[in-house]
Amino acid sequence: WQKFVQKNRDKKKIVAVDEAWTFIKYKESAEFLETLARRGRKHRACLLIGSQFIDEFLSSEQGRAVINSADTSILMRQNPAVVDQVVEYFHLAGGARDLLSTFQPGEAILSLNRNVTGIRVEPIPYEWEYIKT
């Protein structure tokens, strides 16, 4: 951690972690993500988390700390088994429950500094080449 943040102190750093649920399951990597989430801004470091399993984050202290440290959250379609937990944790209105269960690709709830709105992202034609899976 110290070596990472002290190197090139004047440069912004982005740490992107996809499938982050695999890291939050293990004590050492979960603690690193928590430290980065809590202290990164002070050291010009940004943590970008992607995960299909939000319940892994909500069920651990470190995972909740990572979520709580984020200024921005994007909630896409959720597994129906965890929708109630997500709505409660993020203090969403009751209507969000149905949305989170039925969102289509590109639809999400955006929470920015605790301001919440629904969004739809529609790529322009040339972007499709880069995002098709």
Predicted regions and their residues:
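Conserved P-loop NTPase motor module
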Residues: 1-9, 100-133
